[in-house]
Amino acid sequence: MLEKNPASTAPAADGSAQPSAATPDATTDPHLVAPGSADSAVARGERPTVDAIATITEYLDRSDWRVNANANQGYSLGGMMLNTSGKVVANYWLSQVYPAVAGQAHRDADLHIHDLDMFAGYCAGWSLKDLLQQGFNGVPGAIAAGPAKHFSSAVGQIVNFLGTLQNEWAGAQAFSSFDTYMAPFVRLDDMTYAQVKQCMQELIFNLNVPSRWGTQTPFTNLTFDWTCPADLADEHPLIGDEVCDFAYGDLQAEMDLINRAFMEVMTEGDAEGRVFTFPIPTYNITRDFDWDAPNTELLFTMTAKYGLPYFQNFINSELDPGMIRSMCCRLQLDLRELLKRGNGLFGSAEQTGSVGVVTINMARLGYLYADDEAALTARLDELLEIGRDTLELKRTVIQHHIDAGLFPFTKRYLGTLDNHFSTLGVNGMNEMVRNFTHDAYDLTDPRGHAMCVRLLDHVRDKMVEFQEATGHLYNLEATPAEGTTYRFAKEDRKRYPGILQAGTESNPYYTNSSQVPVGYTDDPFEAQEMQEELQTKYTGGTVLHLYMNERISSAAACKELVRRSLTAFRTPYITITPTFSICPVHGYLVGEHLTCDKCAELHPEAEPVECEVWTRVMGYFRPVRSFNIGKKGEYAERQMFTEVAAGGHGPAVSRLSAVSA
């Protein structure tokens, strides 16, 4: 195991050096620090420090780019409190828990240890079935609610559960099979459609309130089955401690009401026409998906306008939808096998998720080891092993504190991290190829593409080694890297002025994971042909966002785009991501509008009325003005996909099979 030593300066929440002044307390537990702690800063009486004055001032005047690192966290008192406490927590992780080599690798931006500002695990998928059957209770000193007996009380418990558990985790909280598990309440309460829709409004509005630490909205994901899964079809629901005289498979009409109500509320948006950022809905598209069902029109009307859903590909997939619920059983399989999670990036499989994430700066490796793939791979292995060590330590620390009661609701509803993955990811593979080849070609060239495939396969092999060595689950994720992509580029520019990057001098960034350059094509099928093989290499979550220049013209056109994509390609996850704008007077506007043309026509003498331009920052929609510096640079360079280009593509042909659509 690697030895840990003190750092001379204190890191901020992202680990970069900060001035010194105030001293946070750090006590040593010999079970929770790396071997070698006798040589640590604490043991020698040296303690990491944070400059309290500078920390508050940088936030108040927004001079620190990290104020906008996360587009879900607005400038606010809560944001200031989280930013301030985050620096203290990051100091604890880097100087008290992790070995010195890991802390230095993070500070130097060789890799990025995510969520250092939060003393918590990454993301978690929960069992909605357990919550509904057991109620929201079991924590000493906290209000206890028994199993819900009605739809409205179930909605209340779901909101309370997700909001509460979000405060014990850094990332997304998810429920799967939402429509299946909620359908019995509709029948038992003999609900009308209007009543179901009212409950859906309460659910959605309440899940979009900034109630999370840092004045953030809880990051939530709901997976919808659409039709009852075979493994639940004959099971009789247990509602209010009583077994129902019907099975889940008898409730398709009730499931349809729930799906219809959810989609109508999401499509309507809020009172000013804004999109609901959460919950992110995921739909499992299977081979028997009914593309002509009445609700399908609503699904693609919603998608064409706001682009909200994630579509999980079970048409060309190694997974069965039932694995989303049975994943906790599947995880007992041979650790020599790399397991695919039933989710994109948000832990949507039941009772599993991710303990933590470490992302490797691939662009730097391409620059430092140009023309020498063997040396690049050797250094990649070193960084992956550092990542492994940090994730093993984090697992030990968080599990210890779950047992000790620091995370009371996680202890009640999860208990163990045994079924949670340790996640490693990559960033900037396109720039890696460019630097490795002195800009002779990039990832879109067959040679660059092949290099990326080789390296991703190599990382997968390392995951198997790590699983066998540790007994813990590992996976490879196309990490969202919302702030990391800019941080890597910013740090590399300081250290290596000649390194090739995307963006501009003031807005540099690296292309996410192994994605094609954002300006590569306006044809979504060309992008998928290029991305398919790379996308299938990820075992811990990946998604291909089809960024459209504007609202898709019709539900039928949107449906055809999704159908062709999922039928032709093995890409695990896709989204349709239209660009739209919100005028404070006229609401939703199609496409990008910095100012409102309608307002200008009505009042030509008045000052232009500014609009919010919305698109997906990574996994979720936010106004472009809330993006961090790097993401603004990416948005400026992005060539949006168009319906015209998609329509002129011809048959979409997979490189991995003879399938076409």
Spans of model-derived segments:
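Mature N-terminal, pre-catalytic/accessory segment of carbohydrate-active enzymes
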Residues: 1-28, 37
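Charged, amphipathic alpha-helical regulatory modules used
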Residues: 2-6, 416, 636-639
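Non-catalytic alpha-helical coupling and interface elements of nucleotide-dependent molecular machines
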Residues: 3-10, 392, 619, 623
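Extended amphipathic alpha-helical segments enriched in small hydrophobics
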Residues: 420, 424-433
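Intrinsic, low-complexity terminal and presequence regions
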Residues: 581-661
